[in-house]
């Protein structure tokens, strides 16, 4: 089962569109679920995601026009409970102890957060944490030189194989990370 994880697009305020090389990779009909950390900013970005997969889950970012998106969401995909937040609620941003506390409160196997615009994926105390970064490479409050990135999770039974796509220069680099639920 393929799950696209992305966020912080900031279209059209900070970027015009997704990188063309990413759009070529994101083909309708291949992805079953989309988990978005927010800051899509417009309905057009949401509509684009709906063309890629029927099951789209979005949480509200601090720049989203649609205030109906929830602050946080828990989604079950296969054997995994996945928590989804934007990340501006985590103080300091991206802080491991704060993320771990939120993971315990939501009682999830995987916690997905954004806001920092920097890709991260790691295991801590048998739980998995993912920050997909910014799919467009939009600048953040702390940094202007952001590497565009998104994550594709392949969920099979009690294993998640995470593929990280990063646009470095003119090339899309892919890294593979595996997490097994214990």
Swiss-Prot record:
Compartments (UniProt record): Cytoplasm; Membrane; Endosome membrane
Pfam families linked to this entry: Metallophos_2
Gene3D superfamilies reported in the protein's UniProt record: 3.60.21.10
One GO term of the biological process aspect: retrograde transport, endosome to Golgi
Membrane association type: Peripheral membrane protein
Molecular function per GO: metal ion binding
InterPro entries: Calcineurin-like_PHP_lpxH, Metallo-depent_PP-like, Phosphodiesterase_MJ0936/Vps29, Vps29
Primary location group: cytoplasm
Protein family per UniProt: Belongs to the VPS29 family.
Native source organism of the sequence: Danio rerio
Function, in words: Component of the commander complex that is essential for endosomal recycling of transmembrane cargos; the commander complex is composed of the CCC subcomplex and the retriever subcomplex. Component of the retriever complex, which is a heterotrimeric complex related to retromer cargo-selective complex (CSC) and essential for retromer-independent retrieval and recycling of numerous cargos. Component of the retromer cargo-selective complex (CSC).
Sorted UniProt keywords: Cytoplasm, Endosome, Membrane, Metal-binding, Protein transport, Transport, Zinc
Protein name, per record: Vacuolar protein sorting-associated protein 29
Lineage: superkingdom: Eukaryota
Membrane-spanning residues: none
CDD domains: MPP_Vps29
Subunit: Component of the commander complex consisting of the CCC subcomplex and the retriever subcomplex. Component of the heterotrimeric retriever complex formed by vps26c, vps29 and vps35l; within the complex interacts with vps35l. Component of the heterotrimeric retromer cargo-selective complex (CSC), also described as vacuolar protein sorting subcomplex (VPS), formed by vps26 (vps26a or vps26b), vps29 and vps35. The CSC has a highly elongated structure with vps26 and vps29 binding independently at opposite distal ends of vps35 as central platform.
An example Gene Ontology CC term for this record: endosome membrane
């Amino acid at each position: 089962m393929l799950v696209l994880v992305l966020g912080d697009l900031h279209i059209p305020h900070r970027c015009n569109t997704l990188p063309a090389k990413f759009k070529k990779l994101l083909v309708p009909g291949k992805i079953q679920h989309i988990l978005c950390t927010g800051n899509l900013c417009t309905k057009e970005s949401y509509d684009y995601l709906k063309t890629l997969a029927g099951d789209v889950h979005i949480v509200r970012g601090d720049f989203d026009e649609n205030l109906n998106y929830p602050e946080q969401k828990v989604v079950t995909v296969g054997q995994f409970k996945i928590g989804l937040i934007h990340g501006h609620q985590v103080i300091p941003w991206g802080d491991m102890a704060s993320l771990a506390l939120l993971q315990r409160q939501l009682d999830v196997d995987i916690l997905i957060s954004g806001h920092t615009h920097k890709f991260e994926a790691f295991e801590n105390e048998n739980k998995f944490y993912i920050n997909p970064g910014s799919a467009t490479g939009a600048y953040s409050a702390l940094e202007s030189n952001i590497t565009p990135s998104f994550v594709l999770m392949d969920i099979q039974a009690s294993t998640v194989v995470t593929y990280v796509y990063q646009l470095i220069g003119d090339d899309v680099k892919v890294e593979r990370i595996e997490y097994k639920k214990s």
